[in-house]
Regions:
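Terminal helices and disordered tails flanking the catalytic cores of nucleotide-processing hydrolases
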Residues: 1-120, 297-416
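Short, flexible, glycine/charge-rich loop motifs used to bind or transfer phosphoryl groups or to couple energy/partner
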Residues: 43, 128, 268-269
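Generic secondary-structure boundary/loop-capping signal
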Residues: 8, 14, 31-33, 152-155, ...
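Alpha-helical scaffolding flanking metal-ion-dependent phosphate/phosphodiester catalytic sites
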Residues: 172, 195-206, 221-235, 239-321, ...
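Helix-turn-helix-type domain boundary/helix-start signal
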Residues: 34-35, 183, 216, 241, ...
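Acidic/His-rich, divalent-metal-binding segments that scaffold phosphate/diphosphate chemistry
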Residues: 79-227, 234-246
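Short secondary-structure boundary/hinge segments and terminal tails
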Residues: 63-64, 198, 215, 255
Length: 416
């Protein structure tokens, strides 16, 4: 790496940016490590008060030889060992076997969300521009191929347990955007849903960390204290005057329920923000399929069943429950199924119009032997071998000792 610090006036398209003299959360850019592609980007940087930048001449253009930079910090080219954090970022942005879009979008967004929560813990609320940049990046990919990004969420669920607030925030954001699109919301409202989902648990940073970790097991005074996170989040985010009112309402009302059993204000259906209800139902689903502390995760199909029952009890509007199930499927991505043929299959996609007939990857034959090459089949379409396959029941991957993730990873190149 060969870096140089130069004045913003010396920056031109074709240079590779690695740092600026303004904190990332005070700019509208998701990342400062990027190729500068046009003059408009440079003008925006100037508008946000950036005066000095650092470029990497090994990845982009250098200054003309006749130009003397204000300060130079040349480092010898060749192999260097980057700091741990920087190395992690570079690995995450390298092509990964053709599945770069979903993997990289998710990894970049996760890194940005982690920075937001780190700043929140220091009492620094994110700018609306920084939050919107993350959401817009994810939304573009959801609009382009929701299967790939939903699969990435499923893979993360399988590979990890007891995930951090950032993991839950990002997954809730992705799934909320999918539901918002399925609900027919216009893009400005989709973005507000995504921003609210990303920040819905911001108030937890103001509560004891050990209490937050066991939040699903608390009762009494601890539970009452945890329920304050909605108001604490609004207070924290309101310190930035530009945060949209609808985003703040999502943060405040995502635990409200249509039957009045929610918190913090026990609002009824007609008083709850519809955008907050979207984030609320996704929040419940994501919590159910995530292992936290001693509480095991539900398999996705069982979580969908619980959502249906919640709709029957009046906790969520039935049309919203229907939209949620249509979005993620009766058998969500990552579900392990037993087919009527005796074969096992992993769900790799959903059919919104035929929710009982997902896209699957058939992994074992009727005798339980593994197929050398799994069969990718749309259960809603006629089979080439004229075999009629239907879902017999849902299996628990843990009990079956099946690593579902290894069957999901290879679909990313195809889906992306």
């Amino acid at each position: 790496m060969a870096t140089k610090q130069i004045a913003i006036e010396q920056l031109v398209p074709g240079m590779y940016l690695v740092d600026v003299d303004v904190p990332w959360y005070r700019t509208p850019f998701l990342f400062h490590k990027r190729m500068v592609n046009d003059l408009q980007t440079i003008e925006i940087m100037k508008q946000y008060g950036i005066r000095m930048v650092t470029i990497d001449t090994s990845k982009g253009a250098d200054l003309p030889l006749t130009t003397t930079p204000s300060s130079v910090n040349d480092q010898p080219a060749g192999p260097t060992v980057p700091p741990p954090q920087e190395a992690q970022v570079e690995r995450a942005t390298e092509p990964v076997l053709g599945c770069q879009p979903a993997v990289v979008i998710y990894a970049q967004a996760k890194e940005a969300v982690e920075r937001i929560f780190d700043d929140l813990e220091r009492g620094v609320p994110p700018t609306p521009e920084a939050t919107k940049a993350i959401v817009s990046n994810v939304l573009d990919h959801v609009l382009n191929d929701r299967v790939a990004i939903a699969t990435q969420v499923a893979i993360q669920k399988i590979k990890q347990f007891d995930r951090s607030l950032t993991g839950h925030a990002l997954d809730t954001c992705v799934l909320s955007l999918i539901v918002a699109i399925e609900s027919g919301l216009e893009q400005p409202q989709q973005e507000l849903v995504g921003m609210g989902a990303l920040l819905h648990d911001a108030g937890y940073v103001r509560l004891p960390r050990n209490l937050v970790r066991k939040r699903d097991e608390c009762s009494g005074q601890d539970k009452t204290l945890l329920e304050q996170h909605c108001k604490l989040g609004v207070t924290l985010l309101s310190e930035h005057p530009g945060m949209h009112e609808d985003v703040l309402r999502i943060v405040l009302e995502h635990h409200e329920r249509t039957d009045g059993t929610g918190f913090p204000a026990a609002l009824g259906n007609d008083k709850i923000s519809p955008l907050a209800q979207i984030v609320g139902i996704v929040d419940v689903y994501d919590a159910m399929v995530t292992r936290r502390g001693t509480r095991p995760a539900l398999i996705p199909h069982d979580a969908v069943r619980q959502l249906f029952l919640a709709g029957e009890r009046g906790q969520f509007p039935k049309p919203l429950v229907e939209t949620m199930i249509r979005s993620i499927g009766v058998y969500p991505v990552g579900s392990l199924l037993k087919l009527n043929t005796g074969e096992q299959a992993v769900v790799v996609g959903v059919n919104p119009q035929q929710r009982l007939k997902p896209l699957v990857k058939v992994t074992t034959d009727p005798q339980g032997g593994s197929y050398a090459t799994p069969l990718e089949i749309d259960l809603a379409a006629p089979s080439s071998d004229h075999t009629v396959r239907t879902v017999l029941r849902v299996l628990d991957p843990i009990h079956e000792r099946v690593n579902v993730a290894i069957h999901l990873d290879p679909i990313l190149p195809r889906a992306a």
